[in-house]
Amino acid sequence: MIFIDNRQNKFEVTEELTKKLEEVISFVLKEEKVKEDCEVSLVFVDNEEIRGINNETRGIDRATDVLSFPMIDYPEDKVYKDVYLEHEFDKCYFDGDELILGDIVLSLERTKEQSIEFNHSFEREACYLVTHSVLHLLGYDHMEEEEKARMRGREEELLGKLNITRES
């Protein structure tokens, strides 16, 4: 299940947008071979709120586009499909029958700014950032160049399969 929580009032959150982002989340989980029913929270905020969260959780006092809060730990250089395909999780990882993957906090304000900066649509930028964040929930990272290349390649591959291009 995907929970949507709109905590900002600067941008209208349309049913079309939420449906598209839910589709992206579900698609990424399927493509990454996640077989369990999962719970993901997607929270929409503005730059002020994400700046506060970023400062509180990472010690970085500036707005960012998206933050990911995975509930599952991953060994270094491993992602969900490398480690957990046949794994039986303890009950503490579940809410009812759903595996809790984690939370995505998305600044719609920053999303709009970046869509203008990168000269593509707001929807494309939102889909990219949600794809990026779901991959973080599944263990992908971009702290090292090799990890970054792997993650960027996977993002582009997934968005391509969804026909979400930079021209979108």
Curated annotation (Swiss-Prot):
Cofactor: Zn(2+)
SUPFAM superfamilies per UniProt: Metalloproteases ('zincins'), catalytic domain
Entry EC no(s): 3.1.-.-
Listed GO MF terms: metalloendopeptidase activity; RNA endonuclease activity; zinc ion binding
Location(s) in or outside the cell: Cytoplasm
Domain of life according to the entry: Bacteria
Co-factor: note: Binds 1 zinc ion.
PROSITE patterns linked to this entry: UPF0054
One annotated GO biological process: rRNA processing
Entry GO terms, CC: cytoplasm
Major place of residence: cytoplasm
This protein's record includes keyword Hydrolase: yes
Residues reported in the UniProt entry to bind Zn(2+): 132, 136, 142
Pfam families per record: YbeY
Keywords: Cytoplasm, Endonuclease, Hydrolase, Metal-binding, Nuclease, Ribosome biogenesis, rRNA processing, Zinc
Annotated InterPro entries: MetalPrtase_cat_dom_sf_prd, YbeY, YbeY_CS
Function: Single strand-specific metallo-endoribonuclease involved in late-stage 70S ribosome quality control and in maturation of the 3' terminus of the 16S rRNA.
Recorded family membership: Belongs to the endoribonuclease YbeY family.
Record's protein name: Endoribonuclease YbeY
Annotated organism of origin: Clostridium perfringens (strain ATCC 13124 / DSM 756 / JCM 1290 / NCIMB 6125 / NCTC 8237 / Type A)
Record lineage: Bacteria, Bacillati, Bacillota, Clostridia, Eubacteriales
Gene expressing this chain: ybeY
